[in-house]
Amino acid sequence: MAREKEIEIQTRLGKQRILPSKVIYFPRGIMGFENQHEFTLLKLREDAPFLVLQSIDDARLGLLVADPYSFLSDYQIKVSDAEQKLLRLRNIRQVAVLVTVSIPPGQPDKTALNLSGPILVNHEAKLGLQVPQVEGKYPAQVYVHPQNETKVAAADARHPDDGGAENW
C-alpha cells in the first residue's frame, strides 16, 4: 500500500503538515466564510480540549472548536433529513459534533461555547456542515468555568465514534 504524501498548509501558528485524507469538505462553507470549503482539524497540544478547524486555503481562517459533550453531557441538536443526506450519514457513529469556542483576550474565565451553530463532521465521508439551531435547551453561548468540577473534565474530550479527537 502506498503511503499518503503529506501536504503543507499555512496557518496563523505557522506551517503545518497534514495528510490529504484529513481534509474535510464543507459544501456550504462555514457561516461567514461560505467561500471556504476545505478544512482540517489541528491539535493545539496533546492534552488540550480544543482543536483548530483550519482552512486549507486561508492561513488566517482558523476557528477554535471543541467537543460540546466534554462540557455538557445532555447537549442536543436537531439535524434535518436534508442535512443528513448532504452529510451522507447512515448512522450516528459516523458523525462528530463540534462547537466554536471564544476566549476573550486576557479573560480565559470568560471562555464560551457557541451552541447555536454546531459543526457536524462525517469522519468517514470527510464531509462537514454547520447546522444552525433555532430552538434548544441551552442559550446561544455557555461559559466554560474551569473551577466547576461537576462538568466532564475537558481533557477527556471525545468524538462519539472513535474515542477522541487525537484520531483526526
From Swiss-Prot:
GO terms for biological process: bacterial-type flagellum assembly; regulation of translation. Pfam families: FliW (PF02623). It is found in: Cytoplasm. Keywords: Bacterial flagellum biogenesis, Chaperone, Cytoplasm, Translation regulation. Gene3D superfamilies: BH3618-like. Disulfide bonds: none annotated. GO terms for cellular component: cytoplasm. The keyword ATP-binding does not apply. NCBIfam families: PRK13285.1-1 (NF009793). Interacts with translational regulator CsrA and flagellin(s). Belongs to the FliW family. Acts as an anti-CsrA protein, binds CsrA and prevents it from repressing translation of its target genes, one of which is flagellin. Binds to flagellin and participates in the assembly of the flagellum. This is Flagellar assembly factor FliW. It comes from Oleidesulfovibrio alaskensis (strain ATCC BAA-1058 / DSM 17464 / G20) (Desulfovibrio alaskensis).
